[in-house]
UniProtKB/Swiss-Prot annotation:
It holds the Pfam family Med18. GO terms for molecular function: transcription coregulator activity. Component of the Mediator complex, a coactivator involved in the regulated transcription of nearly all RNA polymerase II-dependent genes. Mediator functions as a bridge to convey information from gene-specific regulatory proteins to the basal RNA polymerase II transcription machinery. Mediator is recruited to promoters by direct interactions with regulatory proteins and serves as a scaffold for the assembly of a functional preinitiation complex with RNA polymerase II and the general transcription factors. GO terms for biological process: regulation of transcription by RNA polymerase II; termination of RNA polymerase II transcription. Signal peptide: none annotated. Keywords: Activator, Nucleus, Transcription, Transcription regulation. GO terms for cellular component: core mediator complex; mediator complex. The gene is srb5. It is found in: Nucleus. This is Mediator of RNA polymerase II transcription subunit 18. InterPro entries: Mediator_Med18 (IPR019095). Belongs to the Mediator complex subunit 18 family. Component of the Mediator complex. Coiled coil: none annotated.
């Protein structure tokens, strides 16, 4: 699959107004999204990865095929993405089941009201993004992409077995809009207050997270996924749709092609 994209910087003071404009353009309310994004780096040469390990036994055949293709294609940085909610930030880790069973009636009522972050049941998906093409067909960012479901919970063991080491993690907060075949994501990157050598089992309070852009700015990303990147006509039509959106939003933001090397995912 191919992904075609345009990007724009959005100052903090313009965020609310742009949300309203996008809601009017797409005739929908924004869908708020919070994601954990774990960054892994390949340390093993392609062709040596066997995805049939450990928790991956629960994955369907089609997912395993996609994983094989992604993980054996070359040495890249790749992201493992998991959806979370605002309530997960600052929530205590999920207690052990046998401890719950011995709670008194009062404690049981309290536990119902308490939200826990259950890391062991955190869903994940692997997102592969190639370095954007050097000679694009038009003034859009074009790159190969793929994604596949992963086992829930602690993902480091299977990722290590597949030849990937954990590097770091961050969070993304934003709002999604759908405009015909375009996915519009107005978002910002959030850093954790401290570094960790492994994925966190408990998340800090959301107000402890710091924006990557200290000015409070956001990024507007407009993306179209094309199943057959070799079909020139389909790619041309997708590009034209992005240009149409750029024209509709030109009074508010400047959608443009990203710098290719800033999106380089190759592991050096």
């Amino acid at each position: 699959m191919h992904e075609l994209l345009l990007f724009a910087s959005v100052p903090a003071h313009q965020h609310h107004e742009l949300l309203q404009q996008l809601a009017g353009l797409t005739a929908m309310q924004p869908q708020h999204r919070l994601e954990r994004r774990l960054v892994f780096k390949a340390y093993r040469k392609p062709g040596l990865v066997n995805v049939r390990v450990g928790a991956s036994q629960d994955l369907q055949g089609a997912e395993l095929q996609r994983l094989n293709k992604m993980l054996n294609g070359g040495m890249f940085y790749t992201q493992v993405v998991g959806p979370v909610s605002e309530a997960d930030f600052g929530a205590p880790a999920s207690p052990v089941a046998d401890q719950d069973a011995h709670m008194s009636g009062t404690d049981e009522k309290l536990s119902v009201r308490t939200h826990y972050y259950d890391y062991e049941n955190q869903p994940w998906k692997l997102e592969f993004r190639d370095i954007p093409e050097a000679a694009t067909r038009s003034a859009v960012t074009a790159r190969l992409m793929s994604s596949a479901s992963l086992p829930k919970g602690d993902i480091t063991v299977p990722m290590n077995a597949w030849g990937y080491n954990f590097v770091t993690e961050y969070a993304v907060e934003g709002d999604i809009f759908i405009h015909n075949d375009i996915v519009i994501f107005l978002h910002r990157v959030l850093h954790y207050p401290t570094e960790s050598q492994e994925p966190r089992r408990q998340l800090p309070a959301l107000n402890e997270m710091t924006p990557l852009d200290r000015s409070g700015g956001y990024v507007l990303q407009a993306a179209i996924t094309v199943q057959d990147g070799g079909n020139q006509e389909t790619m041309k039509i997708a590009s034209q749709h992005l240009f149409g959106l750029r024209e509709q939003l030109k009074s508010a933001v400047r959608l443009e092609q990203a710098d290719r090397l800033s999106l380089d995912t190759r592991a050096k």
